[in-house]
Amino acid sequence: MKLQPGREAVVRVAVATLWATPEAVRPVDRPALAPRTDIPAWVAGMDTDQRVGECVLSQLLLGERVLVTELRPDGWARVVAVEQPAAELDPRGYPGWLPTAHLAPADPAAPAGEPLVVDAGVTALHAAPNGPVVVPGVVLGTRLIPADGPVDGWRPVHASGHPGPLWIPEADVVPLPTGQPEPGEVLAVAERLRDVVYIWGGVSSHGIDCSGLVHLAWRRFGVTLPRDADDQAEATAPVPLGEEHPGDLYFFARPGRPIHHVGIVTAEPGGDRRMLHACYRQRRVLEEQLPADRAATLVAVRRV
């Protein structure tokens, strides 16, 4: 099977970066473009300014589905990330460009089953229990299909674009929940991402942005939220200011401008307003009381 415009494909690397255009990539981006991506090396190789360059739109995790809309002979595919709603950009999902080496054609006969989800911050898929690493850098929130039951602390799983089962430490995966999670459960997962570096467009425990943190925390529980903060606000329910609880969302906008930031509420009502967020200024995920200038731009409280 080959990639074809108008057909679905799946991500075959641990984390695939979605680019604004193929021409937007920089020399520093080579580790994120390699057929076997090395996102930690990419993050480590960028300076502070490069980490917030708008050439990156989003990121997709191993197994995520895309709709291929164009193929270029130089190894690039224009795609729509159908698991990342983006109503403001495309009703089908988040549009952008991926290297074709990061994709495999969707297989209608691919194994099915009750999914597992990666609960570890970072793990890897191996050729055999304790064997060579085949897919490094697999991150929290990645969904996998079990191939069989556990063996000596390892779990065989099917991975998109890779023949045969691969192996993951059994402790690194859990069954993907099917019900609505408690807000405190989601907040606890998000809190495990404290101090992860801020990467514009990041959606992984290697590097993340504000709306990526929200998207990923709920993805861990099988809940699909939009990718960008303004769409997240539209997709969630309003809560009166002063009645927010941990796990709700704060949204921020300057007068007359669209929403530009989101954070996860961490404090009960009646005290200081606090949130966990991927902070552009501090360049990392942190929990803090809302500074005065941030509080002045608080425009909405919403609940998933």
Predicted ranges, named:
Residues M1-L33, T48-E54, S58, L62-L67, ...:
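Boundary regions of SH3-family modules and the immediately adjacent low-complexity/disordered segments
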Residues A190, G201-F221, P226:
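Active-site nucleophilic cysteine motif
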Residues D293-V304:
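Low-complexity, Gly/Ser/Thr/Pro-rich intrinsically disordered linker/tail segments
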